[in-house]
Amino acid sequence: MTDPFSSPGSPSFDPYSPRLRTALVLTGTGTSGAYHAGALRALHEAGVKIDVVAGRGVGVVGALFAAIDGAQRLWDEKGFWRSKHVASLYGWRAAPRIVFAALALSVMIVAVPLLAVAVGLVVFPIDFVLKMVGAGAGGLTNAYVAFAQTAFAPEALPTWLPRLVLLVLGAAALMLAAAGWSAAQGRRVRGPFWWRVLRPPLSAVDAADYCWRVMWDQVRGATQLKQPTPVDLARRYTEMLADNLGQPGFRELLIAVHDLDSHRDLVFALVGESRRRDLFRRQTSDAADTRRAEVFDLAGASRDHLADAVAASLTIPLASDAHPITFAPDAYWRGETHRICDRPGSLVRLLEELIDLGVEQIVLVSAAPESRGPHELKAPRVDGRGRMGEYIQSADAAVVRDAIRIATARMSRIFVIRPGHNPIGPFDFQGGYDDRSDRRQPLGELLSRGYEDAYRQFIEPVVGASGDRVGQGMP
């Protein structure tokens, strides 16, 4: 097992074997998906056998495409992570933009009198210089004085400027109130009305829509058809995957999200027919009921919930609105509507589920680097998305370390692919600044780093070494 405090990607003490049931786990948030894409490309080129793909957070995107042998869509020149549309993901919601625009416009309006005074500071020196050279000012000073008297008359700027500021701020308040009212539709909410206006600052809707748009390009091929709704497309996806499990390139799929209302993690799984019963079979009825509350079979009646699972995985807790999921009336939750989102700690649950499904070795890919000790400090971020990203990346790194330590008690073959250094934060879709190299790094470099790390940390030292052992008759 990899020592969590050792260098990134150090191999497991137990040898890798291509004969064993293998799972690929992708975990992370935001731009981590680009790192996953690079690692997937390397694993694809090396022909690494993968039986199960599992995802948490943005790792669900890579897992979805890898499960149907479509991972090339992630790293192609016109693929998911090389498209210009990626730069607009997780943008600021309308409310923060309205507030900023209203405040900026109000400041500009209030600054008009100061601008008028500043013009006088320019006019008087010009008038003085013109008089000194004998050119004459042409009444420049007199014209400015007349303008100032007119502008600062009681019925002019002193009256209209406060009205304009009030109009701008009032319009912004009405827009925020309308946004809060529309967001409150659906489930009953508690608390004063004005708290509805203070919604999470980022929007995750575009990320889920973009995922399904690229998936539709993969599924439809060259045919020119209108894209169906995410629910319909998810249903087609699950049917295609269920019908082709066992065929080359098609793999079992696991997704983990968090339910805010039931206070538990939910697992959405599409596994082979021989393992579907293992998802729910337990020794006692109480344990079986718990499984029905937490585990959903995407090959059965829960196939329509795949779209919900993807949307929730791409939902950043606190930073974006939780995704609502409505369960079937005959399901365990009896038609209730719950709020679901991502949770970094659900990686632990994902590893436990994989082990219960008979997985014998795991390849874990994370873009969150492990701190190697002292002398690793960097300047903290002060921008809004940068501050949120720093916490998320730190939490992801800690969860990876804890999940590996917990899973070690049940499995010794866990191989980790992660960068030693990553200056691109989870929300830096246009690239990030690297203090160590004193330059900006585009998102494409993170994809390339995932490719290189997969070869350097896993394929060459682990998979290559296993081939030598197989040739010598070792397992």
Identify the residue ranges that each predicted region occupies.
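Patatin-like phospholipase
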Residues: M1-R56, L64-P475
